[in-house]
Every structure is written in structure tokens, then in C-alpha cells.
């Protein structure tokens, strides 16, 4: 199957810069702002956005990761280990503005699982969602507050995000 590049390295960098600015506008600065990246690529994107916000505001926004494995609705007996915190961050996120970062927004089920994981133990002031790519085909009433690129796709197509931290290149492709 051939690969069609939708975003190259430069486009990804511009997109991250724009999303960082949009998050700052949404929150009116960095006060009480926390970024949580969904493992794996969302976590790397969250750190890139953190770096960009730091370069804009000279403020290091607390950033962590969220592992939704035990909150997925396609896994049997999810609740058995759901009592453990699914996120790794060194600040209390109660009464904070949390922005969840994901690489590709598709059906909405990953985001629903991340909301379940967060709300099981904490009560943020507000939760926002940033996605590098929104490919449509939602199964749940979920939308991103910050979208890098809307990419209309067929259900049988695959959108892949490659990040140099784990893939040795930066690109978004349709396969």
C-alpha cells in the first residue's frame, strides 16, 4: 500500500506552534494549566507543546502522560486495575485546567477512556482536548478544542503519525 504524506516535519512544527498559541489563548496564559499526553505519541506531542509554550511564555507548564489501557471499552474486566492512577505527573491536577493531547482523533473512544481515567480520581476545573490530526468518523459525541489538521478519510484508510522520538522521522501519512 502506498503512503501519502499529509504533514511533513516543517508542517508538524508549525502545527505544534499554532496549537500552543491556541491553548494559551484558551487558558488566558499558563495559570493552572496542565498538559496530559495520551501514551505513546500524544505524550511526545505534549512535551513538544510544553517546550513551545515555554519558549513563548517563559513558563514551564506541568506536563505528564496518561495511560488509558485499563479504561478502554474493548478490554474485558477493565475495572480490576482501574483503581490505580492512570496518569503520571508530578502535580495535583485537581482544580487545574487540563488539556489532553492525542495524536489522532478518530472514534472518540480513546478520549472517553482518558476522561474516565482522569475523573476517577480528580476534579479539574476544565478539560480540553488537542489533537494533531482529526480524521472524523466519531462514534461518541467528542470534539477537539484544538486541531492541527482535519483529514477526511475513508474508514478503511489508516492515518499514521511518526515522531522522531520513537520513529526516527516526523510525518503524518495516510496509508
Swiss-Prot record:
GO terms for biological process: DNA-templated transcription termination. This is Bifunctional protein PyrR. It comes from the Bacteria. Substrate binds at residues 40-41, 102-110, 135, 159. It comes from Staphylococcus epidermidis (strain ATCC 12228 / FDA PCI 1200). InterPro entries: PRibTrfase_dom, PRTase-like, PyrR, PyrR_bifunctional. It catalyses: UMP + diphosphate = 5-phospho-alpha-D-ribose 1-diphosphate + uracil. GO terms for molecular function: RNA binding; uracil phosphoribosyltransferase activity.
Amino acid at each position: 500500500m502506498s503512503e501519502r504524506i499529509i504533514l511533513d516535519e516543517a508542517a508538524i512544527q508549525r502545527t505544534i506552534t499554532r496549537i500552543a498559541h491556541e491553548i494559551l489563548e484558551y487558558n488566558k496564559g499558563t495559570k493552572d494549566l496542565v498538559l496530559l499526553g495520551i501514551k505513546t505519541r500524544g505524550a511526545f506531542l505534549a512535551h513538544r507543546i510544553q517546550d513551545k509554550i515555554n519558549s513563548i511564555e517563559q513558563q514551564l507548564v506541568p506536563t505528564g502522560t496518561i495511560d488509558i489501557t485499563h479504561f478502554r471499552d474493548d478490554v474485558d474486566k477493565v475495572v480490576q486495575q482501574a483503581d490505580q492512577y492512570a496518569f503520571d505527573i508530578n502535580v495535583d491536577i485537581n482544580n487545574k485546567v487540563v488539556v489532553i493531547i492525542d495524536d489522532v482523533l478518530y472514534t472518540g473512544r480513546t478520549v472517553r477512556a482518558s476522561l474516565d481515567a482522569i475523573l476517577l480520581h480528580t476534579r479539574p476545573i476544565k478539560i480540553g482536548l488537542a489533537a494533531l490530526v482529526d480524521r472524523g468518523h466519531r462514534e461518541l459525541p467528542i470534539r477537539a478544542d484544538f486541531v492541527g489538521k482535519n483529514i477526511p478519510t475513508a474508514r478503511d484508510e489508516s492515518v499514521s503519525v511518526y515522531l522522531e522520538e520513537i520513529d526516527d522521522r516526523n510525518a503524518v501519512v495516510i496509508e
